[in-house]
């Protein structure tokens, strides 16, 4: 199984907010929607792109104009297009879809159940915090979740600032039935240490 498919994007920086990439993206996503559906999967990731001096409203409009040209086909094939929320403070400077409020507005304007946001807990803790309330207020727009510890993007245990049992409970209480993917970078160097860290993370998230 695959919780999230990729490969249609150009890059994180060259995304749907820039119209000069629309023709390439439309072709790529049309092809990959077929690949994903034919393989029996459901989710396909996308990215906003960098601002490059662009204001939020222009970016929203451009994303809507481009994504509307593939969403109908995604609906027909039963594929969910998901834009990842990434922090622009540390890891992906200048990335446009760096706040829930911007991403949620994009979802509202597209008005499709086949377009949602990939809520990366690590990234959103860095850029906006208020994780649990944000999830409770906007869960209907989130189709996938990523984990990692803050700071450092390492294990999600008590070596970092987020209390994952409460966050996972909020996700579960929202009625979410999709995937939560462990995306942290283990601090251990040996394979056994990495497997141990993953098992611990799964246990932490088993509420």
Show which residues each predicted segment covers.
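Generic structural signal for short, solvent-exposed loop/turn connectors between secondary structure elements
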Residues: 9, 57-59, 207
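Active-site acidic/histidine proton-transfer and metal-coordination neighborhood
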Residues: 13-116, 126
């Amino acid at each position: 199984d695959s919780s999230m498919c990729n490969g249609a994007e150009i890059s994180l920086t060259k995304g749907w907010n820039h119209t000069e990439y629309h023709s390439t993206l439309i072709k790529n996503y049309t092809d990959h929607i077929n690949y994903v559906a034919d393989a029996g999967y459901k989710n396909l990731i996308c990215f906003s792109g960098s601002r490059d001096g662009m204001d939020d409203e222009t970016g929203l409009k451009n994303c809507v104009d481009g994504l509307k040209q593939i969403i109908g086909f995604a609906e027909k094939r039963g594929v969910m297009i998901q834009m990842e929320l990434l922090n622009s403070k540390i890891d992906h400077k200048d990335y446009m879809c760096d706040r829930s409020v911007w991403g949620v507005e994009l979802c509202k304007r597209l008005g499709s159940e086949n377009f949602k946001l990939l809520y990366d807990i690590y990234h959103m803790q860095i850029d906006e915090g208020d994780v649990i309330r944000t999830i409770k207020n906007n869960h209907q727009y989130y189709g996938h979740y990523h984990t990692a510890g803050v700071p450092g993007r390492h294990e999600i245990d008590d070596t970092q600032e987020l209390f994952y049992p409460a966050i996972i409970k909020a996700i579960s209480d929202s009625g979410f039935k999709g995937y939560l993917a462990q995306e942290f970078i283990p601090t251990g160097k040996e394979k056994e240490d990495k497997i141990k860290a993953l098992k611990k993370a799964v246990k932490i998230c088993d509420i």
